[in-house]
């Protein structure tokens, strides 16, 4: 209490001196300097200002009385009185007075003018007479080492107090030296954080891990840009396995990215574990590079190679983005497997396929070409022969080219109206040309409509049995069409004009071919006009005789021949002539039948 009363008296005198100086509007003093320099400058100032020196003599006398009282109290006086410890220099006393005056004056000493006055007192310490100065020197010799350290810490503490303007907890002001050291910890941490280019590069911002405490301890020495920094920051990545190539690769990768201007500032995490950049690079480059992996969709194999769980959603996208960010520039530089333009093209192509692809896993795939490439032209390649064919009152549904799993394309052809002209009849040729144009337009429209219907059917959720049955039906129609073309090829070698007509009652039908497979008694009823004579007959399919040699035919027809053909001339009127039977040996498909009338249009 006695010491506290002395200190309050001293503080009041300091306040009065400060008010007098403010009234005189004295210029602010220069920043604090070493004690010897301060003493010399302040003595020259006191020569010019004797009143200021006199005030400080009285203050220093009070300080001497305070030291005497403090010496009487001793060191272990009280826990809160650690400021009464061993006598130290006047610099520390004055600074501690500023600290002690903080709670009494509500922070007035810690703010602007208070700090200016404290600094002025620090500068004016050396202005005392020789006796007081020699006494201080003896005390300073006793605790020289401790004073130097505490003086630096006091300066730092006062600078921090100026910045914070007394916002710290007030209890620290009464803790003496211990309070100063506890308040010193945050500036030390800030100093460590301020320090280096390594903080600017950003790799220190790792999550808590086994390497974190040692890394924080290693920040105290000056930062180094050697490889050891990468080992410290990415210790988990380096220690995933004992492969010596791992360290070489990671060192090369990190130095390359640092020189490139895009340093690796964090460890990529996937599935709650460190993403192994080394293994990711090895797996992708073994597959041919990033572009090849994207085009061939090999991300599932990459995921398995990295021992990642297969249940990760969007694993391919995550791996691709991480590879592009951390490893793709390195791949382009070291391996040159692709270029950024190729990568962008692969990403765009993959994105378009993802929008277009259906995830139902259909058994059928459509050809990207239109209906014209899927369906043949209505014209038959018959050189001297003209043939007009149509269905027997109904149309056969056209089907597209079906591409099965073994990529064997089966062209499904559809017989439409196939009008061609006879070489020796110009009137028939003109009519056939007109019918051909109309039939071509109708065929195109029918093909488009049928193709759309078939696509809708195939895209619907039909069982695979129905789809396979549809394929079998189309194959059967294909074989029937092949038999018809084989017969026409045979008749093309004969010097005659042939008209194949159905028994339909339509008057404008030029010709027709009826192909049915409902029962086994199928036949073709036809009429042939040769030089004005009309021959009519019915063609039945006959099995090949066991001894008859079989010649290779078209579309499953082994051989085609005529058994008997009989007829009688009826004149130009075109009346019906009895006909015989024409057999088609070697036909292994359902039989064909057609009937014809005996009049020319």
Curated annotation (Swiss-Prot):
Q: What is this protein called?
A: AT-rich interactive domain-containing protein 3A
UniProt subcellular location: Nucleus; Cytoplasm
* Gene name linked to the record: Arid3a
Regions of compositional bias (Acidic residues) in chain numbering = 139-166
**Expression (tissue specificity):** B-cell specific in the adult. Expressed in B-cell progenitors, down-regulated in the immature B-cell stage, and is up-regulated again at later stages of B-lymphocyte differentiation.
Region Acidic: start and end of each range? 128-165
Identify residues that carry Phosphothreonine. 99
Q: Outline the segment boundaries, as ranges, of region: Homodimerization.
A: 495-518
One GO-annotated biological process of the protein: regulation of DNA-templated transcription
Location of the ARID domain: 243-335
Q: Where is the composition biased (Basic and acidic residues)?
A: 114-123
Q: Please provide the record's keywords in A-Z order.
A: Activator, Cytoplasm, DNA-binding, Isopeptide bond, Nucleus, Phosphoprotein, Transcription, Transcription regulation, Ubl conjugation
| Assembly, per entry | Homodimer. Heterodimer with ARID3B. Interacts with E2F1. Interacts with GTF2I and BTK.
Residue ranges annotated as compositionally biased, kind Low complexity, are 60-89, 559-579, 588-601
From which source organism is this entry?
Mus musculus (Mouse)
According to the UniProt entry, its GO molecular function terms are: chromatin binding; DNA binding; identical protein binding; transcription coregulator activity
Q: What is the effect of changing residue 532 to A?
A: Abolishes cytosolic localization
| Annotated phenotype, changing residue 537 to A | Abolishes cytosolic localization
